[in-house]
Amino acid sequence: MNNKMKFMCTALTASLFLAGCGNMGGMDANGLLSAGADMAKAANLSDADIVQLSDAACKQSDQESKIAPAGNKYSKRLTKLMRGFGNMTLNGQKVNYKVYLTEDVNAWAMGNGCVRVYSGLMDLMNDDELRGVIGHEMGHVALGHTKKAMQTAYAVSAARQAAGAAGNSVVASLSASQLGDLTEKFINAQFSQSQETAADDYSFDLLTQKKMNRKGLVTAFQKLAELDGGQSSMFSSHPSSPDRAARMQQRLDAGK
């Protein structure tokens, strides 16, 4: 994920509730209770809830983005390089992918199998490097990191809006503005250092399993290091891009 993507749910309800109170002047007690209930619900979102929210958030993002059409050079290239992964599923969800036409250098994946790659990233990297990055993003889904990020995005959106219609569906409980806020929070989330490292390893192991070139992970981080001066990466500020490149090279040298 970009150097925006990372949240954690530790002490979530208390910290978000207190942080949000300063902006809740004039809200009645029922409104505050509703916000607290939504935040508590976020920590207990089921896998089915995550898929449902991801479906809605991905659709929202697609509507707000310029998607490369099927005949576009970026779409053709992504389709070709994704063939190496075969019929991938993430936690039982079939992977679906699209390209956003934007100069931003980014990519992300959601719990419903939604994978989105930005053309700015595709301009920067070759196919092996892109497979490494995409494998990393899919790793966040497979390892449960995106579930935590979606739980937090849901809680933050509920806290900011402090409202939501009653209903059985977590999506139905969100207004259109809340859904937009949730989508933005998820895409701009950040993962912990340990999660980023685990996603790197997932991608390396996936590329190994699929018999694809793992060197792309090394050179992808090297390019990001040049892009950001070696201080951070599109995924995270910790560990740094050079450190991650070196770690992947060590795994290559060790033959595992």
Where are the regions that the model predicts?
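A Zn2+-metalloprotease active-site environment signal
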Residues: 2-9, 16-256
